[in-house]
């Protein structure tokens, strides 16, 4: 009989206990099923970068590659992806204590956009503060260029702002 093979990709361990929980579950499963193959990937990110990793994992698995090769190539791919984001609101970060409620309110009232990234350690880091979307979008493109982006797969997500996502897509296509 064929042994079980499982793969899990979690949100960054710097923001959530999902990775630790998945690793604990992996260890328990392997104790009961010693021949099983289970890989757990700490994305060190969230959102669209997490989706890129999942898509690569699915693509490699669909090719029928051996488990170890899928795992190794996915881990290598993760070194070539990056998360950049622009936040219009810091409400959720204030709710979970990551920023003060006063700072979150000021960002909203002043129309400040926070441009940031996921660090190599999986924490969210601010890169810039901009007044409005018109300044934030070019900042995102500039940071993509600084990170060495030369075209390729990009995932754009939005939270109830499809118009802004569409504008960014147009600017992205024009740049690359």
Where are these regions (language model features)?
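N-terminal glycine-rich phosphate/adenylate-binding segment common to multiple enzyme folds
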Residues: 1-19
């Amino acid at each position: 009989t064929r042994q079980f093979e499982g793969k899990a990709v979690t949100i960054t361990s710097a923001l959530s206990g999902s990775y630790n929980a998945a690793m604990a579950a992996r260890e328990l499963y392997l104790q009961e099923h010693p021949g099983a193959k289970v890989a757990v990937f700490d994305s060190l990110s969230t959102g669209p970068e997490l989706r890129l990793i999942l898509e690569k994992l699915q693509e490699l698995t669909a090719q029928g590659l051996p488990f170890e090769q899928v795992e190794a190539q996915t881990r290598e791919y993760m070194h070539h992806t990056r998360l950049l984001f622009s936040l219009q609101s810091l409400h959720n970060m204030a709710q979970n204590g990551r920023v003060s409620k006063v700072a979150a309110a000021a960002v909203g009232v002043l129309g400040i956009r926070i441009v940031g990234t996921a660090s190599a350690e999986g924490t969210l880091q601010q890169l810039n503060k901009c007044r409005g979307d018109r300044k934030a979008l070019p900042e995102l493109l500039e940071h993509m260029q600084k990170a060495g982006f030369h075209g390729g797969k990009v995932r754009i997500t939005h939270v109830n702002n499809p118009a802004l996502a569409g504008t960014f897509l147009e600017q992205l296509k024009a740049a690359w």
